[in-house]
Amino acid sequence: MLEYNIVMRDTALRKLVPANAMRLYTNDTLTRMENFSPQLGSQTTIRHMVLNKSYLLLTVQDTVNFAIKTDLNKADTGQVISKYTYEKKWFKKKHLGMRCNRMMVDHPDFEEPIEFLYLKKHSRKYLNNFEGIPGLLVKYSVVTPDGVLNYELVQKRDYMPNRDLFGVPADYRKVTFDEFMDFMFPSSQSGPGQN
């Protein structure tokens, strides 16, 4: 289990955007990523790393539970060109008692290059976000429309979680993204499950 704290890089925005947390549970082929924010509440993604498919678990209006299916192989990612540039650095740094490799990462939205820390001997497949980093990220930053977010690992526990954690609960309705949008913004046609 990995637990990250998420805060805005810009200290002036930290009062407007409160700190969040992210937990990542994994076994050999599945990951469960749990996020919580005061604005959106709880968000959980269950991803099959081999099949590259996922479910996003959401609760709408505190009553209706949805599991939104996504086939990441078919997802319209387009030709996304990474704006991140990477430069390896010498020497290692300790974080939570672990020796981490260093990488200076730059992006047009960063005021200056930011140091990322990663564990080279641990796979990057669990987070699956920066292709230029050859290991599990421990400390990193992500550009969002609201600003730059800093992620920092605050806890790492090695254990095999209960496999029920990786299933979609029975009270969740499995839908595609289009079916979910039809439910949220109904038109004159019937919504999902009303045919």
Question: What name fits each language-model region?
Answer:
Residues 1-195:
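Extended soluble regions of mature proteins
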